[in-house]
Amino acid sequence: ILDVSYVLSSQEAFVKVVEILSTELKKKNDNPDITWKEMFLSLNEDLLVSFISVLKLLTGKIYGTDYDDIESSGNSPILQVQKILVETGIAQLLIELIFILYSPFREIESNNDIAEDRAIRNKVAEIFELSYILVKEIVKDFLENKIYFSRWVKLFLEHSNFINRTFIQ
């Protein structure tokens, strides 16, 4: 029997992060003078760290192992887990997160200033990268999920054309 208890807590974490980022994005849209730097300084670093853990947890669950052990495990993706991540709405929230983080990420990758907010900016960049990794693993070897995510091909192509690949290792 597949243990899916992690789905609810992961869903709650996604909803919380997307809500916070959506609120911050609305503030930015209402006041264009607010910089992305100011926006992210208002984020709680603990929230970002815990969300990084959620993204790694979900990616590892697809393979039935920990994130850091995916390659060495030799496991194939578990189709039931991939399907659950789409059916529970986590995949939709993941796309919203990627959409919200795109502009801030572009600013982060183009700014190498050593500053007090560097740790937060690095965490935001890591969330952006892990979000794309999770999308890749949700669709791996699963045609139904590839079709589901195909509605966002334009978004993925736009991002791939403009993101500095050397920034994401």
Task: Map each language-model feature to its residues.
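Elongated alpha-helical scaffolds that mediate protein-protein interactions in large eukaryotic proteins
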Residues: I1-Q169
